[in-house]
Amino acid sequence: MTAAAGLYVHLPYCRSRCGYCAFVVSTDDSGRSEYLGALAREATLLESEACGSRFDSLYLGGGTPSLVPPDELVRLVEELRGRFVFEDGSEVTLEANPEDVTIELRDAWIRAGVRRVSVGVQSLEDAELSAVGRRHDAAGALRSLDRLAGAGLSLSADLILGLPGQSAGTFRGSVERICATGVDHVSIYLLETEKSRAIEDDRRAHPDRYLSDDEQADAWLEAGETLASRGFAHYEISNWARPGREARHNVKYWTRAPTLGLGVSAHELWNERRRANASGLPVYVASVREGRRPLALDRPVSEGEAARERIILGLRLSQGVPTADVQSWIDEEGDPLLPGDYEDWRDEGLLAEKGGRLRFTERGFLLSNEVLCRFVSS
């Protein structure tokens, strides 16, 4: 294994579940100490498998990792560094909610080795935040970013497009205000209403409270133009970064670099096997206590699957993929309709070719799900 690997650690605890959340989380942290101990034991189980591999990214995701007390977080990171070989200059990312960020916590994260913080801002409009159960307000979000930027940390902010009550104007304002802070990375996600029964029911009952698909498309394109004018490059469907500030760990997923995952529901790609841990906390903890990984999925990836993944994941990146790889895969797949679809996407300006590489145009990114799903289903 030549490429440096990445390590993901899932910390599932939250004060409350947000209206749009589809991740594995728990609002009861009474078992947190036991869970952190299970993480350390799972790391031990993986130590021999990771022997000889080097890591250059550690991603503490959730859930709400910023809820973990600093002394426990420091111990966890020290345990991981003792089990896995991390390169100098490794990217250590922690996800945080704005309401958790204090000067004291920030300094503790830095002592733990955190160098990058991803903040769940989601919006800078109080009414929009309240509509989906966020616990912070706009002022609190800006205050948290200011505290983090003051320590020289690399900062990422998440925004959501399509929130209840959001207008094109309020979304534009959130993007512009985020650009004026010290962040060097911005992620914009479309609200997936179908993942929340309450939000989907509200959208059906009050469609006037939600931007239409066309309005979301226009707002997304405008946001990209705003970010570009402020020095951010659009490097992946949902992500913009200042030069050199791309999310190193997440890029591993899109380039099929080796990753290991610790914790409930964690996914990984290792030695061309896709694996995923069980999504139930009791099952996870009990399995690790018994000395075995709680795998709900463990299967090899065939050469054909790997080729398909390289295209599907690679097209998510603005650099795209070698045109020859796409053409070769289409020729080998034997789907009689796919070649015609492929030509249509190019003729319609969704895909562009330059320097022997095929990539989505900005408009193409908007319709990327349709295109990528076609590759998946062929």
Model-derived regions: residue spans:
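C-terminal scaffold of the Radical SAM
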Residues: 2-6, 25-49, 53-332
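Auxiliary N-terminal substrate/complex-recognition segments of SAM-dependent methyltransferases
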Residues: 6, 340-342, 370
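Local cysteine-cluster metal-coordination motifs and their immediate loop/turn environment
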Residues: 10-24
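Short amphipathic alpha-helical interaction segments
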Residues: 332-346
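A short, conserved structural fragment
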Residues: 346-356
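Minor-groove-contacting beta-hairpin "wing" of winged helix-turn-helix DNA-binding domains
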Residues: 357-361
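Short, amphipathic alpha-helical interaction segments positioned at domain boundaries
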Residues: 363-378
